[in-house]
Amino acid sequence: QRAALVGNSMGAGLAMGMSLAHPERVSRLVLIGGLPANVRERVTSPSIKRALDTPAPSWLASFGNWLFGGAMIETVLKEIVHDPALLTPAVLERSNRNRQRPGIIPPLMTVQDTLPLWENGFATRIGEIGHPTLIVWGEEDRVFPLPVGEELNRTIKGSTLVRIPSAGHIPMWERPDLTNRAIIEFLQR
């Protein structure tokens, strides 16, 4: 069976990796704020850049998360979303609660370990993607700015880029109306 894969950020990287490793299993791709080649050089969010560049054992990161989690979550979310009004107390509380779940930090820490696999294994082959591909990008993305999405669009032959105004790295949350419309229209073609 084949599936249309939809992924945001690292999830878009997984979707691209799946399309390259098992093209026969993929029918279409929807990449939302997708993972580019040269992630460390392309990321502009100071918090995410710091997380990628700071090696720390997971026990230390877990302790830091326990101690400073709420402040860290708010800082990261302010860099990720365009409209800070979305960061209501309820959203921050829920995000912090999710971040405090036991065992959440070690899997997040594996990003540093798996980034070389992405860069050396899949990122160098993005131009080989042959599936119909929709790229959705927030015009105000501060994790990977719009020119990164435009470059991804040029690299994946035949792809379509949809720019979402007044949205950052999570346009499906910030502008679900425009994001969902673009995805549904693409998947129904």
What positions do the PLM features span?
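Short alpha-helix in the alpha/beta-hydrolase fold that links the catalytic acid
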Residues: V91, F122, H131, P145-R154
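Acidic catalytic loop of the alpha/beta-hydrolase fold
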Residues: E140-F144
